């Protein structure tokens, strides 16, 4: 059962929501436009506001549902964590798109809302604060990722816990997926949320 949960979580994460929306609404391949990501930000810039919101909600749901399914069928915290990271892996490296997907932000948020809604909401709140102040989605995502393990530590009160370690791994993964954005931010070339790339 555990193997099935993990495999199903990866397939759920692999659902190429942004790619399908781009193809259906504008007949474009988001992998070849803008940032090349199939996530909500690239959808926002190249398809529209409401499609981007739809993609964000579905991508968030992939991480949340994967963990909730694991929680329903098993009481093993480690399986919950592996299910969540499997959904994130599917989102970043979807089998249907030959491994070219999103940057794990929305799916990661969904995962942590399921593991600890307080940590998830704290990360989302900080993301929105930075976004409101700077208008940079990438900077907001990176900032929230950096604080994610800190929020998790204060929630747990200890380092030695699978939730803390997975928060650290996801944070590093999100930062790594934004490495080109970091370069553009340092050069002053990064696009704001209301600008095309």
Curated annotation (Swiss-Prot):
Keywords associated with the record: Cell inner membrane, Cell membrane, Lipid biosynthesis, Lipid metabolism, Membrane, Phospholipid biosynthesis, Phospholipid metabolism, Transferase, Transmembrane, Transmembrane helix
Any one annotated GO CC term: plasma membrane
Reaction catalysis annotation: an acyl phosphate + sn-glycerol 3-phosphate = a 1-acyl-sn-glycero-3-phosphate + phosphate
Top-level taxon: Bacteria
Coarse class of the protein's main subcellular location: membrane
Pfam families for this protein: G3P_acyltransf
Pathway(s) it belongs to: Lipid metabolism; phospholipid metabolism
InterPro entries named among the record's database cross-references: G3P_acylTferase_PlsY
Residue stretches spanning the membrane: 1-21, 50-70, 77-97, 111-131, 137-157, 158-178
Residue pairs linked by disulfide bridges in the UniProt entry: none
Zinc-finger among keywords: no
NCBIfam families, sorted: glycerol-3-phosphate 1-O-acyltransferase PlsY
UniProt record similarity statement: Belongs to the PlsY family.
Function: Catalyzes the transfer of an acyl group from acyl-phosphate (acyl-PO(4)) to glycerol-3-phosphate (G3P) to form lysophosphatidic acid (LPA). This enzyme utilizes acyl-phosphate as fatty acyl donor, but not acyl-CoA or acyl-ACP.
Protein name: Glycerol-3-phosphate acyltransferase
Classification of source organism: Bacteria, Bacillati, Cyanobacteriota, Cyanophyceae, Synechococcales
């Amino acid at each position: 059962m555990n193997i099935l949960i993990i495999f199903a979580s990866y397939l759920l994460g692999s659902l190429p929501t942004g790619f399908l929306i781009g193809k259906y609404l504008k007949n474009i391949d988001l992998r070849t436009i803008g940032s090349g990501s199939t996530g909500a930000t690239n959808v926002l810039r190249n398809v529209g506001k409401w499609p981007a919101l739809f993609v964000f909600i579905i991508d968030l749901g992939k991480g949340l549902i994967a963990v909730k399914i694991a929680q329903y069928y098993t009481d093993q915290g480690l399986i919950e964590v592996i299910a969540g990271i499997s959904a994130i892996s599917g989102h970043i490296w979807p089998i249907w798109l030959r491994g070219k997907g999103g940057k794990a932000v929305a799916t990661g948020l969904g995962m942590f809302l399921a593991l600890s809604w307080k940590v998830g909401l704290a990360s989302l709140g900080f993301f929105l604060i930075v976004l409101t102040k700077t208008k940079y989605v990438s900077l907001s995502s990176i900032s929230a990722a950096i604080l994610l393990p800190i929020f998790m530590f204060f929630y747990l009160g200890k380092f030695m816990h699978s939730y803390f370690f997975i928060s650290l791994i996801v944070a590093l993964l999100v930062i790594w997926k934004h490495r080109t954005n970091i370069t553009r931010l340092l050069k002053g070339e990064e696009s704001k949320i209301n600008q095309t790339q």
